Amino acid sequence: MLKKLFGFDPTKTTVRTEFLAGLTTFLTMSYILAVNPSMFSQLDGMPEGAVFTSTALAAIVGTLAMAFIGKMPFGMAPGMGLNAFFVYTVCMGMGYSWQFALTAVFIEGIIFIILTLTNLREAIVNAIPSSLKNAIGAGIGLFIAFIGLQNAGIVVRNNSTLVSLGEITSGSALLALIGLLITGILVVKNVRGGLLIGILVTTAIGIPMGLTEYYGIISSPHSISDIFYKLEWNNVLSLDMVVVVFTFLFIDMFDTIGTLVGVCTKAKIMDANGRIPRVKEAFMADAIATTVGACIGTSTTTTYVESASGVAQGGRSGLTAFAIAVCFAISLFFSPVFLAIPAAATAPVLVIVGLFMMSPIKNIPFDDYAESIPAFITIIMMPMVYSISDGILLGMISYVLLNVLCMNFKRITPAMYILAILFILKYIFI
């Protein structure tokens, strides 16, 4: 029965190992339960409690889909980077409502389902040069780290120089710096659940500093009625919607591909041809989770690279994912603990996760300037203009223009020409 439901193979693992692996993965990725409400509550009409519940529910739905459909040992939850794009670019930067952004996420999920069913996913993936794929991940990492420093008050607005160092002796900045040191030590020592432990320890330190409020430990789950199925179709045909949907789709797709390839390679569960088994089913689980997540009020749900920690513990089947989902279900009743966490305590995690996401930068061929210049533009523009999508658009435009002018036509796919023209028109007319 377990084999049929989860792809469980008793010759490769045990039920106990699978559940321990699930608990390990949950501990390493559960920081999203603190970070997501902290981010989304900055938008009017999105209460922290409701966002906490929707985040946990999205993780439960996605991870259960991965367990029963994908039969893989991966955890899913609203993605870091994707949530930053939702809040800071679409809503705060472009000025759209969170309802507009949720609609974009919903459309992206539907498109992802169609692409998975029709196998067009590979064509889109192959259309983007690898240097830009790596640059996008690195740029998002830099952007997330910048947001963390800003939320902590370490980096502040300056009318003369745009930004400057904040008052680092203030309570918030000081707590964030202490938390960064603690979390950094835990990461260096490879402590399982180091990010979550770092958040909780920093939160505890914030109590005598007057920065952490105590709400209790256990409560019934918060209602999501304020954010449930709040889709907005007014601007669904606008070019901005196209750009936002494309960005969500692009990041989600490569997040999932990168995680599946990396973790499956580490787990040695590739087939004889070096391909991921049941990859189509894993993508379908991701797409379903994103679509459902938009309906319950959260950003794009994606596969977490932290799943590698559970794989290292011995997780090999969907039973590990089932255990992760059970942990998220239990966490619904511990919202007071997560909602008491101040922004200064989540800021260190944003910085550390930013570091993790910067790792693809080493794969960019910096000696090949036709590749590295557009890649650098992609990376640097995201934090500089406070927009993930603008970083992607400017990187793609510069890649096409530079290589066309240098007669490197073979490097440019037809899809890249089309995208570059559309993006240029966006900047001209919108």
Residues of each region from the PLM?
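Helix-loop-helix hairpins and the membrane-proximal interhelical loops
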Residues: 1-50, 163-165, 197-280, 421-425
